[in-house]
């Protein structure tokens, strides 16, 4: 029976390949090559596609059933690779890969930009009070924490205390740095009011970037002590490496510093120029809608670019790792999961 199912699945895949320009479908595999930046960029554009937020319950069930039919070799004739890739995209966007439960819409990766943009606009509002600075930094870190938790690796039980620790560390560092920098700018008498206002607009970036690093370190410091799994080219477990863990945390931290840079730096620069135009000076009510559009554009570009910097499964030479790792495999390189 297993041979029959495999033959049927292969025949269906062959028929799909002949009727579609899409690459041959591979269940559970990315549609685009992950070895190049462009391939990863295309892959993450699919993951954050906000159109999947509007998928109906019926369409989700159809997508899941189509993938089940493919898996068991019972795929109906005429199904194309494009339909299979689309079904997998829908399932991965909505259902958690480990629990198979629906992820709450605001915390899906496809909802990160639509639900995160209003927070970015709030972070960049001019003339903020102490209370508003604290509120927007807290809301931003709360949203990030919920996204991280909703998309966590659920194959192994993880204590809630670890997530709470990372969340509190991120909130405290973000709020303290934002408030501290705002106070310093306000007390800097050598700046003109206009210069002071311009500088204050850039305060959210160092606050958010430092909070992101703090969050990564607090939530994953255990990996530095215990190491992370490294695999050979065939996917076999070679061992656990602390050096690979350092590389993984460094890559993740760098990604989380790069991500807010265009989101929180470009809009203030663009808005400082747009505010001088005759249109916005004559119609100040347009300032907030225009800033929202600028933030949305920056967010939409920055997110896929930042998370495409490094492959999800990063490669490292065994000669750079612990001697016991190098001795445990004949492979010249091994791979590790860097995490989100």
From Swiss-Prot:
Primarily expressed in the brain. Pfam families: SFXNs. GO terms for molecular function: citrate transmembrane transporter activity; monoatomic ion transmembrane transporter activity. Keywords: Amino-acid transport, Membrane, Mitochondrion, Mitochondrion inner membrane, Transmembrane, Transmembrane helix, Transport. InterPro entries: Mtc (IPR004686). It comes from the Eukaryota. GO terms for cellular component: mitochondrial inner membrane; mitochondrion. It catalyses: citrate(in) = citrate(out). It is a multi-pass membrane protein. Belongs to the sideroflexin family. Mitochondrial amino-acid transporter. Transports citrate. Does not act as a serine transporter: not able to mediate transport of serine into mitochondria. In brown adipose tissue, plays a role in the regulation of UCP1-dependent thermogenesis probably by supporting mitochondrial glycerol-3-phosphate utilization. This is Sideroflexin-5. The gene is SFXN5.
